[in-house]
From Swiss-Prot:
Compositional bias per record (Basic residues), positions renumbered to this chain: 35-49
This protein's name: Ribosome biogenesis protein NOP53
Region ranges (Disordered): 1-51, 303-344
Organism: Homo sapiens
Region of interest: Nucleolar localization signal: 347-395, 396-478
Source taxonomy: Eukaryota, Metazoa, Chordata, Craniata, Vertebrata
Function of the protein: Nucleolar protein which is involved in the integration of the 5S RNP into the ribosomal large subunit during ribosome biogenesis. In ribosome biogenesis, may also play a role in rRNA transcription. Also functions as a nucleolar sensor that regulates the activation of p53/TP53 in response to ribosome biogenesis perturbation, DNA damage and other stress conditions. DNA damage or perturbation of ribosome biogenesis disrupt the interaction between NOP53 and RPL11 allowing RPL11 transport to the nucleoplasm where it can inhibit MDM2 and allow p53/TP53 activation.
Length: 478
């Protein structure tokens, strides 16, 4: 085993010495120059990478990079450039006549002519010309355009020119008169007019034309609905505060406002007491017991169950007899009618139709004598409809100033801003402020049916609260 291990180790060390490039000290070591170079497949990507890292590949890359640099900087290879491009004849300095100092104006003009640095950065520094030859199949309709050019060349030899050329020549021969731009003295002063009035002077040229044509050609604006011209509420936007809300009110005005605020507070207190009375728990004597609850649940069930069986018992035998024994009328219908019976039925039917027609004619004749009564009934009906219409109109006018219910909540009037008699001061510096402008504007919008009343969103927990007892606490607890 030891010998085998030492042999393997010797092979591995000799291989590493050979790969390192140094001459080994072992007798089995080989000169790196005489070592055979390892070759591999060159048609695979692995071979391409190895070839690029070898000296020949690096030399080729450097040569190609040098060629590209010469093409970018000088426009071609320096070895192929002529002598005039590489050398010049020195005939002396050209700055002899420029010994004079430049003035500030000259310096400024030179600075203005000098291009900006940002423009120089964006300029193309490469001298390699852009490719101009485009293949024919890359141009859309190339064959068609080529045939067109050949056709126009043929027509040009015959003296016929394209339409665009003929139009250009006609414009040159007959130039149009240039219109002078109107100056401020040439403009006609137009009087002011109401933009929203019905007699708009801009609409006068469209008067008398077809409305459908004007709408389709977009020369006539869309007609605004009449409801957009009416306000949602006739209430004023800004309400004047009552006289009692002044910082220095009279005694009567202040007492009147205090009584109004007192009535509002009493009404609110009554509603709260009513709600509390309805939701209050009943007394011990009136509390519901288990027996009373069961009796209420069974209320009306026992009487209905006793009376339900009697009708069914009486109907059972009769229904069975009806199914067993057919009625005589049913037997008569099954028999075939004779010709005499059919003639009698037709005569009876014809007689009934004649009697009905005579009766209808008699009634129509009698209606002629009831014209006065019918007119009176129509007049009463029209008067009733007019009265209902007036009542609806009056109700609508009365509710015009009242807020409508636009959403889920009703409109609640704001509290009356009033100060007590003890809070009134004789100085504006010590006056206590009342109300809020932002809240007042929002309440005004709600009262004028412009926005719906809202309330603050209630907090609702999305998950259930879970109580967990910690293990450390559970172990310590006795």
């Amino acid at each position: 085993m030891a010998a085998g291990g030492s042999g393997v180790g010797g092979k591995r060390s000799s291989k590493s010495d050979a790969d390192s490039g140094f001459l080994g000290l072992r007798p089995t070591s080989v000169d790196p120059a005489l070592r055979r170079r390892r070759r591999g497949p060159r048609n695979k990507k692995r071979g391409w990478r190895r070839l690029a890292q070898e000296p020949l590949g690096l030399e080729v890359d450097q040569f190609l990079e040098d060629v590209r640099l010469q093409e970018r900087t000088s426009g071609g290879l320096l070895s192929e450039a002529p002598n005039e491009k590489l050398f010049f004849v020195d005939t002396g300095s050209k700055e002899k006549g420029l010994t004079k100092k430049r003035t500030k104006v000259q310096k400024k003009s030179l600075l203005l002519k000098k291009p900006l640095r940002v423009d120089l950065i964006l300029e193309n520094t490469s001298k390699v010309p852009a490719p101009k030859d485009v293949l024919a199949h890359q141009v859309p309709n190339a064959k068609k355009l080529r045939r067109k050019e050949q056709l126009w060349e043929k027509l040009a030899k015959q003296g016929e020119l394209p339409r665009e050329v003929r139009r250009a020549q006609a414009r040159l021969l007959n130039p149009s008169a240039t219109r002078a731009k109107p100056g401020p003295q040439d403009t006609v002063e137009r009087p002011f007019y109401d933009l929203w009035a019905s007699d708009n002077p801009l609409d006068r040229p469209l008067v008398g034309q077809d409305e459908f044509f004007l709408e389709q050609t977009k020369k006539k604006g869309v007609k605004r609905p009449a409801r957009l011209h009416t306000k949602p509420s006739q209430a004023p936007a800004v309400e004047v505060a009552p006289a009692g809300a002044s910082y220095n009110p009279s005694f009567e005005d202040h007492q009147t406002l205090l009584s109004a605020a007192h009535e509002v507070e009493l009404q609110r207190q009554k509603e709260a007491e009513k709600l509390e009375r309805q939701l209050a728990l009943p007394a011990t004597e009136q509390a519901a017991t288990q027996e009373s609850t069961f009796q209420e649940l069974c209320e009306g069930l026992l009487e209905e169950s006793d009376g339900e069986g009697e009708p069914g018992q009486g109907e059972g035998p009769e229904a069975g007899d009806a199914e067993v024994c057919p009625t005589p009328a049913r037997l008569a219908t099954t028999e075939k009618k004779t010709e005499q019976q059919r003639r009698r039925e037709k005569a009876v039917h014809r007689l009934r139709v004649q009697q009905a027609a005579l009766r209808a004619a008699r009634l129509r004749h009698q209606e002629l004598f009831r014209l006065r009564g019918i007119k009176a009934q129509v007049a009463l009906r029209l008067a009733e409809l007019a009265r209902r219409q007036r009542r609806r109109q009056a109700r609508r006018e009365a509710e015009a100033d009242k807020p409508r219910r636009l959403g889920r909540l009703k409109y609640q009037a704001p509290d009356i801003d009033v100060q007590l008699s003890s809070e009134l001061t004789d100085s504006l510096r010590t006056l206590k402020p009342e109300g809020n402008i932002l809240r007042d504007r929002f309440k005004s919008f709600q009262r004028r049916n412009m926005i719906e009343p809202r309330e603050r969103a209630k907090f609702k927990r999305k998950y259930k609260v879970k109580l967990v007892e910690k293990r450390a606490f559970r172990e310590i607890q006795l």
